[in-house]
Amino acid sequence: MCIRDRIAAGAESGCEICKELKTLDHYLVKRSQWIIGGDGASYDIGYGGLDHVIASGEDVNILVLDTEVYSNTGGQSSKSTPLGAIAQFAAQGKRIRKKDLGLMATTYGYVYVAQIAMGADQAQCLKAIREAEAYPGPSLIIAYAPCINHGLKAKGGMGKSQAEEAKAVECGYWHLWRYNPELAEEGKNPFSLDSKEPDWSKFHDFLLGEVRYLSVKKA
């Protein structure tokens, strides 16, 4: 029984203090707790901890800022770095594909999982965060986050990171989706693909707009 229910029960039983507290129970909101980290920690060196947390079934929210590289330490390749991208320790382009953290988390069946890109769809981003907060169990949101190590060629550089997110989704480089276990309990499909059908004709230009991929072509 939560504190609101206890106060309500006390008020109904005639407790004067509880009656007074009940007039203020709109201040008793659920505390929002989030663990925020990058892809290096979440996909790679701290994955064991992340997996332990989501497997626990506890009501905890995790937000992964996916830059697809170790941003804080100089741009080293991580398990989130995509196939072909140039980074430190992958000077000729990474030779193996990116780890699909979101898909792996959905296999538990009781973890809320979403993939977002605020610059591509703010409404979907907010919806995923609200659903994760409301879900009574572990939730994992993976957010695409352009990084200075990507080497954005667009005029304005990192000042255009939101536009870069939109391009990534439009061309099919990054997908927007949500997996809500509560829908499965209602007999519905728990998976929702929120991004539109990609315009694959723009995929090549998107890659050439970032030094991490353009350099592979020049090599």
PLM regions: where:
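Short, small-residue-biased leader/transition segments that mark boundaries at the very start
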Residues: M1-I3
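Thiamine diphosphate
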Residues: G10-Q76, Y112-V113, G119-P136
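Conserved thiamine diphosphate
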Residues: Y27-V29, T81-A134, G209-V216
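Generic structural "secondary-structure junction" signal
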Residues: Y43-Y47, H52, S71-N72, A85, ...
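Short secondary-structure boundary/capping segments
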Residues: G49-V53, Q76-I86, A154-E164
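Glycine/aspartate-rich loop-and-adjacent alpha/beta segment that forms the canonical ThDP
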Residues: C125-K218
